[in-house]
Amino acid sequence: MGRLEVLFLGLTCCLAAACAAKLGAVYTEGGFVEGVNKKLSLLGGDSVDIFKGIPFATAKTLENPQRHPGWQGTLKATNFKKRCLQATITQDNTYGQEDCLYLNIWVPQGRKQVSHNLPVMVWIYGGAFLMGSGQGANFLKNYLYDGEEIATRGNVIVVTFNYRVGPLGFLSTGDANLPGNFGLRDQHMAIAWVKRNIAAFGGDPDNITIFGESAGAASVSLQTLSPYNKGLIRRAISQSGMALSPWAIQKNPLFWAKTIAKKVGCPTEDTGKMAACLKITDPRALTLAYKLPVKKQEYPVVHYLAFIPVIDGDFIPDDPINLYNNTADIDYIAGINNMDGHLFATIDVPAVDKTKQTVTEEDFYRLVSGHTVAKGLKGAQATFDIYTESWAQDPSQENMKKTVVAFETDVLFLIPTEIALAQHKAHAKSAKTYSYLFSHPSRMPIYPKWMGADHADDLQYVFGKPFATPLGYRPQDRAVSKAMIAYWTNFARSGDPNMGNSPVPTHWYPYTLENGNYLDITKTITSASMKEHLREKFLKFWAVTFEVLPTVTGDQDTLTPPEDDSEVAPDPPSDDSQVVPVPPTDDSVEAQMPATIGF
């Protein structure tokens, strides 16, 4: 290389370095923080400022979080912090720590000046309220919830954070002694911190979108319904989960609190004494005192999700169905994956994924019965009949297995999402409502050929993995990812997924009560991807036919839990006798029927 070329290259690099904007140290309510500035090309230019591990709150065991007191000097925010204490996948050990309430920020930067007034997207992770972290799963330091691709492609600020999970996040006695919802309050504290501090990072505190998947999606829904977040949230996106999901609210927290108390040696007759004892118990012992059964359980696995949000009369003041007035001015996108129920079906009916094993009518009826306990034998039979109508014409194992997956998808995700969309639309003032179905098939080679999009399959596309790790993906995967990032970030910017900095493949029309408009997201998105009346027949069955069946009260119509086995997780209660009463209401605020959905 000649001397002139070397001089030119050196000058180019110097100019790039000089022109590249970066934040440096940022002053927050807790003190100064300094992250790292990552260049997006060798010659400089665009970059992203990354801050990892900023504390936003502190919390004692089984108590509400408090604002972080701050620090001296400049905090070097360059590494992710450990996740909140939780059980390992094998449920025989723990990892993480109690000191875990930290957040991470990605800020895209241009060439000449630091970003200003950018939309802010705050991510809430899923994991059954039992596991997870703000950075997500890690493979060779490639973290699932790395916000770089969303931030730089959509020109938005991305924030992720940790919140408490499992017993430490959601254990409740159902009264004031241990009200629960500690994990939800952690989430609220993170959102409130962003509201107070994000302007210093170049964000618009009046344009915050919260988004999440699964338990994170239900959390997003609950945060929009909680009066604590009034004025904090402008928009929301729920991917495969809502506050109305049957696994999102624990109606019998005392049952599970007593179960934990017995295992760790705390009293169970007096909730005050129980709470005092649990608060001084080794947090790891509390965490390991609960195990989610994933084999040979009597009921569908979601019935064993013990430590989840509760109606506490405060943060969640009432049944979520009664709180949709609180979302009247919050724009909303909600949707599901077309085979979201597959993950749960493989636990409840293991033969679904086994090519050499068959699913029987008895298998499916047992599954249906487990999900329709409240309506007794009539509910189980009516549900079984409508879902097996196609079996007479096509009794193949493929059809039967797809029926199992479709049923779990409907019960756990589609029906609650459709009802929530209708509630949001019916109560909207300025708010806009959008619906989608993610149908891009799973890339897992071990799955059957008929498999669609499993639970959580959408995450890799929303977080831009086909671009971050291109060797593992096809061009069609990058097309899906590009479209999702464009729709999501446009929505965060304007409240309309079609309007923003990023072009989209087709116009996404809003949801209506009459037509139930939704965007079908797959490898080719065209005008034909806008569809109506998703699974109308089954939605009508659940919202009308099933709903009007009498709720059983007699033992003859309920499933009887098997005898207790100390080696396995306890069986969920089968009736309402132990359910914690809903806070008293008057006639003006009694439980509402869902908004009418057009059929």
UniProtKB/Swiss-Prot annotation:
Keyword Glycoprotein: yes
Glycosylation sites recorded in the entry for this protein: N207, N325
Catalytic residues as annotated in Swiss-Prot or TrEMBL: S214, D340, H455
Classification via SUPFAM superfamilies: alpha/beta-Hydrolases
Protein origin, superkingdom: Eukaryota
Annotated region described as 4 X 11 AA tandem repeats, O-glycosylated region, given as residue ranges: 559-588
Name of the molecule in the record: Bile salt-activated lipase
Organism, scientific name: Mus musculus (Mouse)
